[in-house]
Amino acid sequence: MARRSQGTKLHLAVLCLVVSCHAIGLSDLMERASQRSDKLHSLSTSLNKDLDSHFPPMGRVMMPRPSMCHTSSLQIPKDKEQALRVSENELISLARSLLLAWNDPLLLLSSEAPTLPHPSNGDISSKIRELQDYSKSLGDGLDILVNKMGPSSQYISSIPFKGGDLGNDKTSRLINFHFLMSCFRRDSHKIDSFLKVLRCRATKMRPETC
């Protein structure tokens, strides 16, 4: 019941945003998107902490490097200073491309979480579903934003996800699950950073305060 209620609230929030989008200014839409991305990143950070609590000792050694994340091929600003020099259209395109690239991986994580060999797999599974809800909600909000910003902001880079199996043994499943979540946390931070820069520009805040 709680799960259904939360999903309904998110759906209603998106519906209200769609219905009233023409009456809402760009800066307000940016603020709403920034709030969603902040929640997405906070939730992914919480999930990584849950996974860390029962991570095998050899996990850090065996876990793939961040450069192996499937989104690493996307050319993006490395820090805030670089992001501040990127155009609004490119930043929104990067944020949407990263978010869209996680649709399939989140489906995989959602299907694997209930049977993950981890004592908190129930909580982890619930949080993964929340991630999916917030990701969908944020994506819908960004679609509204780009419609306001114009055609030049609507380009999306296609980033294929070739993974579909976390492994057969317990250690491999935990390591690969944790690796995917660490990649998502990294990308959710980037999305959040890009949207905060866009919010600052929309509200005409000084760059150093972004």
Swiss-Prot record:
GO cellular component terms, A-Z:
extracellular space
**What domain of life?**
Eukaryota
Subcellular location, principal: secreted
Disulfide feature: 69-183, 200-210
A Gene Ontology biological process noted in the UniProt record is:
positive regulation of respiratory burst
Q: Where in the cell is it found?
A: Secreted
* Pfam families named among the record's database cross-references: Hormone_1
Q: Which UniProt keywords apply?
A: Disulfide bond, Hormone, Secreted, Signal
Any one Gene Ontology molecular-function term assigned to this protein's record: superoxide-generating NADPH oxidase activator activity
Say if the entry is tagged with keyword Disulfide bond.
Answer: yes
Record-annotated membrane-spanning stretches: none
Q: Where is the signal peptide?
A: 1-23
Task: Spell out the family assignment given in the record's similarity comment.
Answer: Belongs to the somatotropin/prolactin family.
UniProt-recorded name of the protein: Prolactin-2
Organism per entry: Oncorhynchus keta
Q: Quote the gene name from the UniProt entry.
A: prl2
